[in-house]
Amino acid sequence: MVVHVSNPVARLTRTQVSQIFLRKALLWDNRQPVLPVDQAPDSPVRRSFTKEVHRRTVASVQTYWQQETFAGRGVAPPERTSDANVLAYIRRFPNAIGYVHADARLGNDIKVVIVTP
């Protein structure tokens, strides 16, 4: 998981990350809105993230979001087509959180958040 360097979060549990990306957790501890950003549905990193964090398939999470949207309860996080686009989103919106490939070049304005079981 990656966030803007100004974000005070350093560690999250897998459950917290899942809640953030399913928009069940809406605020950081500092009361600022959490802005999750997903990768494209066909991205290998998205498939891996979804399996590890949500314990579901991408299709299952997409179905969840279709139901939530139809019921008027929320909309899915925005999707970006590459690591570079996820990082650009986080740079633009310091309250954002996303995920990228392990070998992505982060730069000094992005930091890694440790995810624990």
Identify the residue ranges that each predicted region occupies.
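Exported/periplasmic ABC-transporter solute-binding proteins
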Residues: 1-117
